[in-house]
Regions:
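Hydrophobic/aromatic residues located in beta-strands of well-ordered beta-sheets
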Residues: 42, 70, 215-216
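N-terminal, intrinsically disordered, polar/charged segments of Gram-positive cell-envelope systems
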Residues: 10-39
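Hydrophobic membrane-insertion alpha-helices, especially the h-region
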Residues: 1-6
Length: 316
């Protein structure tokens, strides 16, 4: 299973989520928490739009709707490159540091195998907090004020001088081939010219590491953050073909009807600008609320059936 966010956590969240859903869905709670032994585990891989907050996340809604085992993996502020690192596809290194005898933080830079400095792992996530460097276990942290990473060894020991590229290791997830991956990344990727192609490069790395053909890539959603989001999604669709789920298009069209919401004046202004209606979003106008997450879970379920990853009879 993927580390960091286990199935038990999702099960507990799922119950809270069902209670939350009752506020706008007059349906009885389904107390079932057992997953069918023959159904796949679903791995939801991404940033804050996947990790969610408290009891509201689309993986929680997905678990509630299908009764499948669901695992979350990633980090709230992760770029696609960060997730490729967390998955173990991209190895990271450090160099030219001295790890002291005591548990004193030491500044370090992170490099790739070609000695290029990487601007990565600035937020917390499923792994790469507890790490090992040159056989010494410790904690990797990012100081946003000083814009530097630090390594603090767990226990006092012998000083270690590092003068060559040395891998920073962490616990890496394993993935079973018959399971399903939902990849929802790119929202926090750098907004540079042709940046979407870097997103695709790292999404390819993630898919390659998963070693499965059973995956779905969710579209980018936020035009507020990504002004050319529709053009970016066209590129993603061309790359991922039938695996691509255009959730943004759905939200701007059928999602309003399916959610059974009455558009507010603000929602109508949002739609005129090509923005996701505020009624689907949290106060940050980026992350989805419970309605958003429920609709995404439903669209992913439909997509998994269309792609024959699951059978509709598998759903509770």
């Amino acid at each position: 299973t993927l580390i960091g966010y286990n199935t038990l956590t999702i099960r507990k969240e799922s119950q809270k989520y069902q209670e939350l859903q009752q506020k706008y869905q007059n349906q009885p709670l389904d107390e079932t928490t057992h997953s069918n032994a023959n159904t796949p585990t679903i791995y939801c891989i991404g940033d804050s739009l996947t990790i969610g907050a408290k009891s509201s996340s689309y993986p929680t809604a997905l678990s509630s709707a299908t009764n499948f085992s669901v695992n979350k993996f990633g980090g709230a502020q992760d770029q696609t490159q960060d997730i490729a690192i967390r998955m173990g596809k991209i190895k990271i290194y450090t160099n030219n540091i001295t790890i002291p005898e005591t548990a004193t933080p030491v500044n370090l830079k992170i490099y790739d195998k070609d000695n290029n400095v990487l601007n990565v792992l600035k937020g917390k996530g499923s792994n790469f907090t507890t790490v090992e460097i040159a056989g010494i276990s410790g904690k990797l942290k990012y100081n946003a004020t000083k814009k530097t990473h630090t390594f603090t060894r767990d226990q006092n020991g012998v000083e270690k001088v590092i003068t060559k590229l040395t891998q920073i290791k962490s616990e890496i997830p394993t993935f079973e081939k018959n399971n399903v991956a939902i990849i929802f990344t790119g929202t926090y990727d750098p907004q540079t010219q042709n940046g979407i192609f870097k997103t695709i490069t790292y999404q390819r790395a993630i898919i390659n590491q998963l070693k499965t053909k059973n995956y779905i890539v969710v579209s980018l959603t936020s035009k507020r953050r990504l002004p050319i989001v529709d053009d970016m999604n066209k590129v993603l669709k061309e790359e991922h073909k039938e695996h691509f789920l255009d959730f943004r298009y759905y939200l701007l069209n059928d999602g309003i009807k399916d959610a059974k919401i009455t558009l507010t004046a603000q929602d109508k202004k949002d739609l005129q600008k090509g923005y996701i209606p505020s009624s689907f979003l949290q106060v940050d106008m980026l992350n989805g609320n419970a309605k958003f997450n429920q609709l995404l879970a439903e669209q992913i379920t439909k997509k998994m059936i269309d792609l024959k990853y699951i059978d509709k009879n598998d759903i509770k």
